[in-house]
């Protein structure tokens, strides 16, 4: 069994969840023969700051036209940090009319309401889509048709799973929808008056996911796959990944992982013993040498840096390999290192899996690796007095 490195991440003064690092971030093969990361293998609710507001929402950060590493289709409204305890707000652009349907949401009796939106472009009915949530004594699994909303209580380090389970190929499953090979999830920690959560691509892509948080003070934040990704077919998304990433990463979206998942590099050839296990070695040597870093170098796919989130992010984003970026003990020295995302992923070696999800994420944000929250570029959002969360699930 691979060794897992776990860190607690804090926001607004309390722990919001766990982020799993290294070889375990990809998890073992999925329990349903999915050829990819299984539900128990990934990151929890890693902290960070950021998020971006929906169009027309009151914004506490200024919108900008920042580009993540110049990747095709990237850009969008990255924002400056928002108010304390909240995700930064920026421009999310306009989704198709009716995409974010917030009608018929009753007031919550617990903390907040969740509403589930079928955005599979007619591929599946609400009876074919399922959500599942388990926490303590809670165990709920329902189709979107049966229960399109859920009154969410306070809970810590929670995951809500989404499944496609239709009576015919290619996603046929019988009896238990949670045995479907086509699934994905969101993560959250919800306090009595606080929402903290994110979409994630740390483990893999399984289904298109986006979510919009609405709070009592009018704050809104929207994160996840962008409108163009939701509009295209599943085959097109897989083909686009293969077309846009370098040769070393193409197999992540091909069999045996496809058609079920696009897996993170550590679940593919970048793991220990894999054909790309030494992919980052030359850059790591440069980064360590330029900064006189004395801590141990990471293992394959950057594993072993649980206590050094900035170093981890630097390796995956291909930055920081100049003197003055880090202290000898591996701590960030150049506080401006994360200010310009156009410098990220600019040349190899870099985590082009993560870059792809940033390029096709709302506002250029994604959770493409465990410490993608460094610099507020992840899909993590946090705000007080949440009223509802809209979750869009696509195919």
What are these regions (language model features)?
Residues 1-22:
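Sec-dependent bacterial lipoprotein signal peptides
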Residues 2, 22-24, 82, 171, ...:
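Secreted/extracellular small peptides and ectodomain modules produced from precursors
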Residues 16-96:
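Ser/Thr-rich, Pro/Gly/Ala-heavy low-complexity intrinsically disordered linkers and tails
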Residues 96-395:
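Extracellular low-complexity, O-glycosylation-prone Ser/Thr/Pro/Gly-rich "stalks"
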């Amino acid at each position: 069994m691979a060794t897992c490195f776990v860190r607690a991440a804090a926001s607004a003064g309390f722990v919001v969840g766990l982020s799993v690092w290294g070889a375990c971030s990809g998890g073992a093969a999925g329990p349903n023969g999915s050829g990819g990361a299984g539900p128990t293998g990934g990151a929890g609710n890693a902290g960070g700051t950021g998020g971006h507001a929906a169009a027309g929402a009151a914004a506490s950060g200024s919108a900008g036209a920042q580009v993540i590493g110049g990747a095709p289709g990237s850009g969008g409204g990255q924002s400056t940090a928002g108010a304390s305890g909240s995700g930064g707000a920026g421009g999310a652009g306009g989704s198709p009319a009716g995409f974010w349907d917030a009608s018929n949401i009753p007031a919550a009796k617990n903390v907040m309401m969740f509403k589930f939106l079928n955005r599979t472009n007619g591929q599946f009915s609400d009876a074919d889509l399922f959500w599942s949530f388990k926490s303590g004594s809670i165990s709920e699994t329902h189709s979107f048709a049966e229960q399109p909303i859920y009154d969410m209580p306070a809970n810590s380090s929670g995951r809500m799973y989404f499944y496609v389970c239709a009576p015919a190929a290619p996603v046929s499953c019988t009896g238990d929808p949670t045995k479907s090979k086509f699934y994905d999830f969101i993560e959250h920690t919800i306090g009595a008056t606080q929402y903290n959560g994110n979409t994630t691509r740390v483990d893999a892509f399984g289904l298109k996911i986006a979510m919009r948080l609405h709070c009592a003070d009018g704050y809104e934040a929207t994160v996840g796959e962008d409108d163009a990704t939701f509009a295209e077919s599943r085959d097109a998304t897989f083909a686009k990944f293969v077309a846009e990433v370098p040769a070393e990463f193409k197999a992540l979206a091909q069999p045996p992982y496809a058609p079920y998942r696009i897996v993170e590099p550590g679940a593919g050839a970048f793991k220990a013993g894999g054909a790309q296990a030494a992919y980052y070695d030359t850059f790591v040597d440069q980064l360590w040498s330029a900064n006189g870093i004395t801590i141990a170098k990471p293992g394959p796919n950057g594993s072993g840096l649980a206590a050094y989130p900035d170093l981890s992010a630097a390796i995956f984003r291909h930055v920081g390999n100049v003197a003055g970026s880090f202290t000898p003990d591996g701590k960030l020295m150049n506080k401006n290192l994360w200010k310009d995302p156009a410098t990220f992923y600019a040349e190899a070696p870099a985590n082009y899996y993560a870059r792809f999800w940033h390029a096709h994420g709302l506002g250029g944000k994604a959770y493409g690796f465990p410490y993608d929250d460094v610099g507020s570029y992840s899909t993590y959002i946090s705000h007080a007095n949440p009223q509802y969360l809209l979750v869009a699930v696509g195919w």
